[in-house]
């Protein structure tokens, strides 16, 4: 189990660092093997910051991230099981390295004792597992591959490890529609094999398509979480309702005069003061105002 417990990230801002900015505020969630959890929010909601903390690219200011009950510590032992794929696949490659070298570097770092012939077989298997033809990929530079091929190559590289959890941060936003569906279906196949996926997205339709659970972030806080069917089918927080109202429907036409949904959302809980997540329905949590301060805990 990959778990986040009260994870918070604050930054010092201002000319002399006298002010603080809270990018992620007391977030808790669990990701199980074979589960896809969508982390949903607009730009600036804190979802990418949260993903970077899971990957050890940023340290939490407070809280804990654990893997099977042990505190996550960035390093070989952790990255052998937890990897990430990002929005712009080109930024993840050295432009002078061919695909062969990208994959072979994994052996030098993690499996130095594996023979050349065995490693080549592993490479070909991992490429085929993500729908890539080794003959068309190996020997090519990143600029010679499409965005979809580069995303698949990143996933194939991760599969060469003992991968258990994948952070997928906006990985389809730069892909065309057909390639996007191919990558999503690939994640679904990997999920069926036991891979846990934290799917970071601002696109509600993709979150609805791929995940069993949805966690909605607003200004760094979880405002609603639960099964995807509950959160999307019966949204209980005004921010979630506003997000859903912005998704085009097949029965609606642009400029048709339909209801635009709720207006501005005043704050994470819609009220002044402190707030907490309460269980409105079994497994369906929503942020509400309270009189006292209670720690936030999302659904397991």
Stretch-by-stretch model annotation:
Residues 141-145, 149:
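Conserved ABC ATPase signature
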């Amino acid at each position: 189990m990959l778990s986040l417990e009260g994870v918070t990230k604050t930054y010092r801002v201002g000319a002399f660092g006298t002010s603080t900015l809270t990018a992620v505020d007391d977030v808790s969630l669990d990701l199980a093997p074979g589960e896809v959890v969508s982390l949903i929010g607009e730009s600036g909601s804190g979802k990418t910051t949260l993903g970077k903390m899971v990957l050890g690219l940023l340290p939490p200011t407070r809280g804990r991230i654990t893997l099977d009950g042990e505190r996550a510590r960035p390093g070989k032992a952790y990255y052998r099981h937890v990897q990430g794929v990002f929005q712009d696949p080109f930024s993840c490659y050295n432009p002078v390295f061919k695909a062969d070298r990208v994959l072979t570097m994994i052996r030098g770092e993690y499996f130095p004792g594996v023979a050349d012939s065995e490693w080549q077989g592993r490479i070909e298997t991992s490429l085929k597992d993500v729908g890539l033809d080794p003959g068309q990929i190996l020997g090519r530079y990143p600029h010679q591959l499409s965005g979809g091929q580069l995303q698949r190559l990143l996933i194939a590289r991760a599969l060469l490890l003992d991968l258990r959890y994948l952070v997928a941060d906006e990985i389809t936003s730069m892909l065309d529609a057909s390639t996007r569906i191919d990558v999503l279906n690939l994640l679904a196949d990997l999920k069926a094999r036991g891979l846990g996926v934290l799917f970071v997205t601002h696109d509600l339709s993709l979150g609805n398509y791929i995940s069993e659970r949805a966690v909605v972030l607003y200004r760094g806080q979880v405002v609603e979480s639960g099964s995807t069917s509950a959160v999307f089918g019966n949204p209980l927080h005004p921010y979630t309702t506003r997000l859903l109202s912005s998704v085009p429907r097949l029965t609606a036409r642009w400029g048709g005069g339909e209801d635009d949904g709720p207006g501005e959302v005043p704050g994470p809980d819609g009220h002044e003061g402190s707030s907490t997540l309460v269980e409105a329905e079994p497994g369906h949590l929503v942020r509400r105002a309270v009189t006292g301060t209670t720690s936030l805990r999302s659904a397991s």
